[in-house]
């Protein structure tokens, strides 16, 4: 049950830009919630409350991030299942699946890689945590010839074992998928309670052509 009280549970309300970035980070956590309980010194409510619609100018960006979370629900469910049965963490430091890559260990302490983490084995999240940041450097762990595909920008492929420059406009968080991965997505929904559609879309992120032929297996469980 890992996750933030997005916007902060106490103290002053966040500014619009960093609120968007906080939401974009939070949607990848098992526990995602936007709320707060701010009080005066005497314990009475101070009238502030963090809500998705608190800043109308950035509401479309907040909505897009939340919709991405709902499309990822099948993937998140599989990760939670593996956490319960195989004791594998959902949120992983870059070195956890790349223990033989010394740069992955170094990246964990590098300021430029603050906010980078793996979501399961397939996805790499490169969160933006600075005001005004529209590009960020991110280290992509060395995974042989598999490399990493950008979730955005038409699926640009990057070789692992290097630091790359990723575009980070305010309307999205840099997200990459490991080459050779299969990710099952759902249709967008308003909430988990209304997500009745059983339609699933399989997104395949292939090995690069230089890898030659390959076979990828996927075990999927929906209770």
For the regions a protein language model found, what residue spans apply to each?
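Catalytic-domain carbohydrate-binding cleft regions of carbohydrate-active enzymes
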Residues: 1-172, 178
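Accessory, solvent-exposed terminal regions and/or long lumenal/extracellular loops of proteins
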Residues: 170-223
